[in-house]
Amino acid sequence: MILVITNKEDSHPTPVIQLLTTRGISVFRLNTEALLTDYEFCWQNDAHHCDFTLANIQNGLSVRGTEVTAVWDRRPEPPTELPLQSTEVVDKHNREEALGFLRFLRYYLKDIPSIGSIVYDRVAASKMLQTTIAQQVGLSVPDTCFSNRKADILRFAMQYKEIVLKPIENSNIWNEDNEEEYALYTQKTSSASFHDVPEEAFTQTVSYVQNYVPKAYELRITMVGRRAFACKIDSQCLDEDKGKTDWRQGYDYGLKHEIYNLPQDIADKCIRFLQLMHLNF
C-alpha cells in the first residue's frame, strides 16, 4: 500500500494514482487540509505493538499503518477544515492540534521508503547546504554570497561583469490590495549598478547573489533513487525577460524541452548528492 500525503488542490498525484491502480497497486490518498472533516483516524500502542488506522469517510477507503510499504509526501497543507465552527480561539487551537498530530504521524513514518521526506526535505532546501554538498560531490557551482550589507554585496559583485539576484525562500508576492500575485524570477544585472543602490535597500532584507554564468542550454534533472531523467531546456533562444535568464518565464513564449542523455559521471554525482542529502527524490 502506498500512502500519498498531499492536498486537494494538487492535481499531479491523480494520474499517478490512476496508473498505479490499473497495475493493481493499492493507494491511499490523504488530503491533509481535510484531515478532520474527510477522515477518521486512530494511532495507538499497547505492550505488543504500535499501529494506526486511516479511513476516508467520503469514499470508504482505509489503511492500517502496518500495510503502508511506501510513502509519497507531496506538498501536504496544514489542516484547515473543521466539522463544526466554534470561537476563533478554539478553532485555532483545534487546527494546531491537528497539525501537530499530522507532523508527528509523518515523523513516525520516516523509516518507510518514501518520495519526499518531512525530516530531510526542509533541510535540503537550504541554498547554503545545497552549494556545499554540490561542491563536495564535484559539481561546479556559481560563486555565491548572502548578506544584508551593501559592502559585502558590492565587494562580491565587483569581481564579475554581471551577477544574478535570486529569491531565497519565497518566489511569489501576494498583493492584497489588488488581489494579484507577482512572481520573483532570477534577475541579471550589471555589477556596477549596485553603486547607486542605497544602503537601506540591503539592510531591509537578505540579498542572495551569484556570478552570472553564460550557458548554451539548461538541464532539469529529476532523480528518482539511482535513476536520472534529464530534460534539455533551450532557453537561450529567448529574450532576456522571456526565459533566457530564468527559464520559468519561457512557458508562454515557446520554450522547448527535449529528452537529454545525461553523461554517467554527472548522473553519479547527482546520485551521491541525493545520498548525502538523505533523499530519494
Question: Model segments located where?
Answer:
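A short linear hydrophobic-aromatic micro-motif
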Residues: 143, 207-208, 281
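A short, acidic, amphipathic alpha-helical segment used as a generic capping/interface helix at domain edges
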Residues: 265-274
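Conserved metal-phosphate-binding beta-hairpin within the catalytic cores
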Residues: 274-281
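Short, well-ordered alpha-helical microsegments
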Residues: 12-14, 150-154, 216-218
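Loop-centered beta-sheet repeat module
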Residues: 123, 129-183
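Phosphate-binding site of ATP-dependent enzymes
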Residues: 20, 158-262
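Extreme N-terminal starter segment of soluble prokaryotic enzymes
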Residues: 1-3
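Conserved N-proximal alpha/beta basic substrate-recognition cap immediately N-terminal to
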Residues: 7-22, 30-143
